[in-house]
C-alpha cells in the first residue's frame, strides 16, 4: 500500500504542484486548504507524513503544531511534519520561523518554491526515519 501524505496549503497552485510531484512517485496524497481542514484530515486519513504551510487562513501552521502538542492528539505525534515557508521572507523572519518550528517539534523545513527533487528527498528521508521508530 502506498504511503499517504497530507499536504496542507491555502495556495491551490502549490497544492496541485506538490500533489503532482508526490503522486508521480507513487505516494497517495490527501490535501487540505487550511489548518482546520488539515487537522480533520489528519484524524480521518491517518497519513504517514504531513506537509504543512505556515501562513494560512483560519488556522495557520503554527497553530496546527501547537494543537498537536495537546495530549488529545498524542496518537498522531509519530507523524512527521515538514513545514513549508515562503522564500520571500527576510532572513530574520526565516530564522525565527525555523527556531519556532524546532520548538514545536517540527521534523523538517523547506522553503517555497522548492525543486521537485528536494521535496522528494526530504519526504523520503522523513518517511524512512518514521519507519525506524
Regions found by a protein language model. Give the residues of each.
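Short amphipathic alpha-helix used as the core "switch/output" element in two-component signaling
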Residues: 40, 62-75
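Helix N-cap/capping motif at the beta->alpha junctions
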Residues: 31-40, 61
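Alpha4 helix (beta4-alpha4-beta5 surface) of REC/receiver domains from two-component response regulators
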Residues: 63, 77, 88-110, 117, ...
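Active-site beta3 strand of CheY-like receiver
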Residues: 45-51
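Charged docking surfaces used in two-component/phosphorelay signaling
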Residues: 16-24
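Receiver (REC) domain active-site loop signature in two-component systems and cognate sites
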Residues: 56
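The C-terminal output helix
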Residues: 121-133
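Active-site residues of response regulator receiver
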Residues: 9, 53, 85
Amino acid at each position: 500500500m502506498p504511503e499517504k501524505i497530507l499536504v496542507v496549503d491555502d495556495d491551490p497552485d502549490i497544492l496541485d504542484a506538490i500533489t503532482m510531484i508526490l503522486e508521480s512517485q507513487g505516494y497517495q496524497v490527501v490535501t487540505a486548504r487550511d489548518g482546520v481542514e488539515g487537522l480533520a484530515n489528519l484524524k480521518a486519513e491517518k497519513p504517514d507524513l504531513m506537509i504543512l504551510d505556515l501562513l494560512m487562513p483560519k488556522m495557520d501552521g503554527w497553530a496546527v503544531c501547537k494543537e498537536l502538542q495537546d495530549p488529545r492528539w498524542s496518537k498522531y505525534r509519530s507523524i512527521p511534519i515538514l513545514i513549508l515557508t515562503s522564500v520571500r521572507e527576510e532572513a530574520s523572519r526565516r530564522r525565527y520561523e525555523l527556531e519556532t518550528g524546532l520548538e514545536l517539534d517540527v521534523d523538517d523545513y523547506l522553503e517555497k518554491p522548492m525543486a521537485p527533487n528536494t521535496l522528494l528527498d526530504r519526504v523520503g528521508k522523513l518517511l524512512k526515519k518514521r519507519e525506524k521508530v
